[in-house]
Amino acid sequence: GSLIYMDEDLDEAAKRVLNELTGLKNVNLMQFKAFGSKNRTKDPRDVHWLERAMQSKVERIVTIAYLSLVKIDRALNRDLDNYQASWVAMPDIKALAFDHNLIIKEAITYVRQYVEFNPSSLFDLLPRKFTASQLRTLYELVYDKQYDVRNFHKKIALMEYVVPLEEKQQGVAHRAARYYRFDKKIYNKIRR
């Protein structure tokens, strides 16, 4: 996070901060919640770090949280000396400063609800053509649960907008999996 400048609105600040911390640009950010508990600054170590980083006295902190669904293959800017931005698997997230673990928990809840109403958003995270295994893995990551392979294939069969291709994987050591693609036209027709 960072401070909001006087000459920018919240969305502009969120894009600027994302770029400063990660190097990512042209990302669709969604504002999902404000965090302003009076106890956010109860740990003196957090306050000390923040005052040093911001070079000003801190009495109260309000966070307007944003998130985005971004393909993990997007490279993060490694040239940023002050920040060690990296992709981290959800189970590997350790204790964070302030209430940032709560913010992540709330973000996960928001993403799950968002995906329920906008299932097409998941397909933006997959390659143009993908396997059932790749789609199942994505569902498992989002919903933090395991899906039976056969039942998941049945689930895919019910998704008219997930179109099987004649093409299969090449050069794999296991049985080649069929590719699928997301058909936005069919999806939009069904969703009306």
Which residue stretches match the model-derived regions?
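Short helix-to-loop capping/linker segments positioned immediately adjacent to catalytic or ligand/cofactor-binding
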Residues: 53-55, 73-76, 118-126
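NUDIX/MutT-family hydrolases
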Residues: 63-69, 76-113, 125-133, 151-152, ...
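Active-site-adjacent beta-strand/loop module that shapes the phosphate/pyrophosphate-binding cleft
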Residues: 39-74, 181-185
